[in-house]
Amino acid sequence: MSAPSGIVGEFMSLKRETAADLLAMQCGDFYEFFGEDAETVADELDLKVSQKSSHGSSYPMAGVPVDDLEPYVRSLVERGYRVAVADQYETAGGHAREIQRVVSPGTVIDPDDAAARYLAAVVRETDGDGYGLAFADVTTGRFRAGRVADATAATAQLHRFDPVELLPGPDARTDDPAVDRADDATVTLHETTAFAPGRARHRLREQFGETALDAVGLDAEAAVAAAGAVLAYVETTGVGVTASMTRLGPLDAGDRVTLDATTRRNLELVETMQGDTDGTLLSTVDHTETAAGSRLLREWLTAPTQDRTEIRRRHDAVEALAGAALARDRLRELLSGTADVARLAARATNGSAGPRDLVAVRTALGLLPELAAAVADTPLSDGPVADVLAQPDQSAARELYEELESALAADPDDPGEGVIAPGYDEELDGVVDDYEAAREWLDELADREKRRHGLSHVTVDRNKTDGYYVQVGKSSADDVPEHYREIKTLKNSKRFVTDELAEREREVLRLEERREQLESELVTEVRERVAEAAELLQTVGRTLAELDTLAALATHAAQADWVRPTLSDDRRLAVEGGRHPVVEATTEFVPNDLRMDDDRSFLIVTGPNMSGKSTYMRQCALIVLLSQAGSFVPADAATLPVVDGVYTRVGALDELAQGRSTFMVEMQELSNILHSATADSLVVLDEVGRGTATYDGISIAWAATEYLHNEVRAKTLFATHYHELTTLADHLPRVHNVHVAVADDDGVTFLRRVRDGPTDRSYGVHVADLAGVPGPVVDRADEVLDRLRAEEAIEARGGEAGDASEAGDSEPTQAVFDLSAGEFTGGSEGGSSDDGADGADEAAADDGDDSDAPAVDPETEAVVSELQETDVTAVSPLELMSQVQEWQERIDDS
């Protein structure tokens, strides 16, 4: 097959220049895809595929109009594709095309998207366990980098930033645990040379200045390599994109609460266990009016701060806004629909901001004095809210607003108005005046021709094929003057042109072209001016987002009757009338208290299934996190410590789907908690050891409790069905028991009240009944449970014996579990039989005659004696297990 030529050949040549998955090449008024790209795009976006011939071969072709490209590209990027865009431009020889930008999941800039879009790089150290990490959000200009100690820490950071695109370094591309856990990110293999530390360090200093690396402590080679690779990748995606990145920050300033992926999932901060966004903490408190505000609220909830000053500053602002309803509502009204200024600044720096984007920037800048006026003469005029509004340089913001106000038309979408305001550019004003005069001449031409030549049904119009023309109705078509030249005959009319009309048309086209050229040049100048102010606009964007977020938290606090928490200085945690923030929004909720301090730091929570243990523990964790996010909390009163991390162990649904056993996942999560938690952490354990044998489970839970109590000393809430663990409160000074109360006078009623002390029952059979387990099964379970409690023998009912009974045979034989003997023995449904009577007689005959009885083994006798003397309540399960194992070995050896 011959190589394609023409447009197809040019497309194939450009495609070889890029590592992007797809190429969109401009061909006039359309962007076209050819070959496999066309088939892929048509399949993903439901486009029609046609064929393009080249050198005797046919190639699939699909296209989208130039004006509609961006939404199509965003749709492809959301599906994980990287899309290169080749624009067309004029040359002396005709048309030429070159790739101007590459849009990938980590570099797409959509002002309407509320979520952060981080691009990440992961570099594994060659001489250690550490990793270098870098995260950049090109939509807002945020850039952070640093080193972490190991794969676990790297995974935690990846889950914290949740990147949409990941660049693994040369040593992190195969079977790397950190990269493997970035499940939702598109993995892009960037060129290896971009990770070279020397080149990366040079690139970073050029971008951020000589001292930037030292200022953030970016001295580890792996971290430098990761940051440099991100910057290099962003540079390859489009000219000017990196201009929005004006600051390099540390990966972790050390003031964020540690929340690993397991905890975020278990607490359902932004996504439920089922993967939904409704029913989460974020969806409950998100009353924001802007995309930037929603994004900031998400950041505060998923990465709360440990900085007491910052927490109190947010609490002060929320308190002020909650108490000033009218002013708060006015602020939210003004903010409603405000554009994402930081992202618009990023679009300006990469040259993609259009007139509408620039007008949106102007509108946002114009909001600043309106917002200030809204709080003037109110309780908000002096205090934390006023401080937030004062963050941007007001003089610089006003100056930029005035420039944009004088430069841009009120409505750039109005085709008759243009995009540049009258009076901004003298030459453009002259061109517009001449153009309007020419258009006026054309508009009046039909009336003039009617009067001059006595014609009826005369119109003047224009299309792409014929240009400007005079259309005369059929009844007057034969009466037109001689200088009319006919160009087309229609069913009821004819079209004509004249020399004068053709001259006017050329003048109009020249003026239109000149107007478009001047407006394009002026828009570019305005865009460059906005790009120069990127840092100012990022500050304005943060200000509007913060004000929106604080107002949203205040709105929810006022609506849900939340209270301001007090920060304790002695690590005391006291909640009165605490509630679950999500559950209380959908159903009537029973509030509960919680008290923990240095003398009461470990609570063992017992109670029936479905009684509310898990909800109680989660609500406690969420109350602490809400406080450190800067929010009020769902309680009557709350005094809370500042924690450095929240760790949870609840379930293993995701990992089970990946083929990892429940118990293995449980132990890995427990291991992470035991290694990571500190005395300033909050730990929530909802069952430990349930994925293995009972004794093993109790032993692990017991040992973990001792370790958390004695070594870690973290505040811990531990829900368990192992009632043996409740005895730890008698041996470990800071362990206390609480339980969820149940009333069982007439059936079982879950009271949802948490009270001091342990519970003695789990009511599992009742829960089975509530779940719809068949009645016979529930009844039999009750019967078995009663016998177990009375330490009576349990008869195991069989099916085959029942068939024999129906045939007229003897009573069915049953297997009976003798609790005292610890084994199954033969028995019958009725509890007696002839064989049984004979056996009893034989036993009676032998009673008292032990001449043939075997002698009791001395070692066995010693074991029995020791067993009788052992106080099982005075030793731990681990010690008891060890002793039982020793007894078994002694009997086996005797």
What name fits each language-model region?
Residues 139, 145, 313-323, 342-347, ...:
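Short, charged/polar, low-complexity loop and linker segments
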Residues 30-31, 35-45, 50-51, 167-211, ...:
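A conserved P-loop NTPase coupling/switch region
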Residues 437-463, 540-543, 550:
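Coiled-coil termination/hinge junctions
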Residues 258, 269-274, 287-289, 363-437, ...:
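Amphipathic heptad-repeat alpha-helical coiled-coil/stalk segments that mediate oligomerization
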Residues 2, 35-38, 498, 550, ...:
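ATPase nucleotide-binding head domains, primarily ABC-like/P-loop NTPase cores
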Residues 1-278, 283-292, 310, 314-317:
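Basic, polar low-complexity surface loops/patches
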Residues 863-894:
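C-terminal tails and terminal domains of large nucleic-acid-associated
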Residues 88, 241-252, 448-461, 554-577:
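Long, charged, glycine-rich C-terminal linkers/tails
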